[in-house]
Structure formats: C-alpha cells, structure tokens
Amino acid sequence: MKSGREGGTWIGMKSDGKFAATTFYRQSKKFTTSKAKGRGHLVSDFLKGDDDVENHLKKVSNEGDLYNGFNLLVGELSPNGETKVGWYCNIEDKQVTMLKPGIHVLSNKTLNCSWPKMGYGKKRFARIIEETSTKKDLVDELLWLLKDRKSVV
C-alpha cells in the first residue's frame, strides 16, 4: 500500500445513523496525478467527525482540487425519521448538493447519470424495497444487488 493511503475505506456506517461512501470518478489517466491526496480517508473523516452533512461536504469541497476525481456521499439517519443526505463531486458541478427524498444512484461518474448499469441498479433497488417484507430479506436482497455482476449494455 502506498504511503498516505492506508487506513481508508470506500463505504461505512455507524450505529448512530451516520453513513458515507466514496467512488472514484472515471476519467482519463492524463487528468490524474500521482501527487494527489489519497481519498480513502474521506469516508472515515465524516464518520469520526462531528460535522453535519452539509458542513462536512463544504469542507471537503474546499480541498477538492487536491484529489484525483471522486464522488462523496454522506448522510445521517435520525431516530425521528429525518434523513439528511448530501453529495459532492470534485470534477463535475463541484457544488455540494443536498438530496431530496427518492431513489438516487451513484457510480463512477455523476449522481443519477444515465449509464445503463445505473438504470438497471435503480430498477432492481426499487423492486427490492417494494417487494421485501422482512429486515433479513431486505438485507439479503440488497447484499445480493451489491454483488450483481450482470453486464448491462
């Protein structure tokens, strides 16, 4: 593992309802640099920190140019049902976006982009949450979806 890249993760959730995930942004190697900061800490920084969703993403956006391309999705689920989810991409848009309720998809481009695999995943996810009646089945089905390697063209 390269120095400065250890200890990171791409997805995480805490028992208090905080969660985060990051993806790299798919781009030509000519637009990346080996001198960029590692992105692995982006998820754990949110999970370990005290900032709310929007403030955390604003802080990350202030340093966005120091990294190769990435998406960062962070959120908080509260016991009263209020959910706050935000997204930031350091390549396109470069604005912190607070998400409205609904199903959103994220891969290696922008949020809700129109890649075939995104449409496929969104439809599968919607069907799973509509048709699943127990927590165990929901978890099993969602894990199966994450493992799905079906080629969609």
Locate each region found by the language model.
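N-terminal nucleophile
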Residues: 1-153
